[in-house]
Amino acid sequence: MLSSEALAKAVNTARQAIALAVNLDALALIKAEHLGDRSPLALARQALASLPKIDRAAVGKQVNTARSEVQRDYDERLATLQAERDAAVLVTERIDVTLPSTRQPTGARHPITILAEHIADTFIAMGWELVDGPEVETEQFNFDALNFPADHPARSEQDTFYIAPDGSRQLLRTHTSPVQVRTLLERELPVYVISIGRAFRTDEVDATHTPVFHQVEGLAVDRGLSMAHLRGTLDIFARAEFGPSTRTRIRPHFFPFTEPSAEVDVWFASKKDGADWVEWGGCGMVHPNVLRATGIDPDIYSGFAFGMGLERTLQFRNSIPNMRDMVEGDVRFSLPFGVGA
């Protein structure tokens, strides 16, 4: 047990050390030495149990008083050092609120979004309507009503994402053409609509393919429509996207849902390959079976339809060598197209 003189010496030593602490780290070490579990004051408190009961209260009071003095000095020094630290931080990390702020870099709208909106504006200006449909479709709308035969290869799991459970006849639409059927079932004739949305096929991602892509689909059904109306519409569309001098041509092709069917090309001058005919999309007159499937008499009404891939359009229009750039989400790809977020 410490004597009164030793106890006073321990207190003085601790108070002097606390007063000389220059920073919070030094003060923490001093606290451990003079107020910690192995400090002289802590050992003196532990020794109280060995004293006679008659002396324990008086000596215990002395020890508690001594510890309180040291603790008080410690608390005061701690507050002082914390205030000094905070003042130093305010000086070194001061922000001048009168200075202009640092401009934060902004993102950019994806060029596919920009292209889709431009296409929509083009057709809305012509009096067409913008329509939409579900991405999870049934075989009825995606294939059957569009005159796809039961053994058509597009129905296989090698080409189409089917939705579990097996036999549900639900799938991720492989094109935006199901919107045609839904529109004809839901609207009064005549119909002039476009649909812009995502489609899904089991393609590997490479320079010219991606399993999730965007299509624009146009449909017109009215009395007396012909291939001439289709050609005129395609010419207006092409000039809106590629410039006023753009030329188009159509080549015979086959699609289950149009007859006659054609592929449409545009005469386009790229920076890399020069001017040439470039395949753009598919088109044709709506097949009579598609009209019948929606309750329309093909002897009274006729229609035309066309469809283009937005990624394909953007790729050759802007000379983008790799379609992967469109799906990787790197804002540096979108910025050159010039429209901020």
UniProtKB/Swiss-Prot annotation:
UniProt catalytic activity: tRNA(Phe) + L-phenylalanine + ATP = L-phenylalanyl-tRNA(Phe) + AMP + diphosphate + H(+)
Superkingdom of the source species = Bacteria
Under the heading Pfam families, the entry gives: Phe_tRNA-synt_N, tRNA-synt_2d
Q: Where in the cell is it found?
A: Cytoplasm
Q: Which InterPro entries match?
A: aa-tRNA-synth_II, aa-tRNA-synth_II/BPL/LPL, Phe-tRNA-synth_IIc_asu, Phe-tRNA_ligase_II_N, Phe_tRNA_ligase_alpha1_bac, Phenylalanyl-tRNA_Synthase, tRNA-bd_arm
Instruction: List the cofactors.
Output: Mg(2+)
Assembly with partners or alone: Tetramer of two alpha and two beta subunits.
Q: What is this protein called?
A: Phenylalanine--tRNA ligase alpha subunit
What is the originating organism of this protein? Mycobacterium leprae (strain TN)
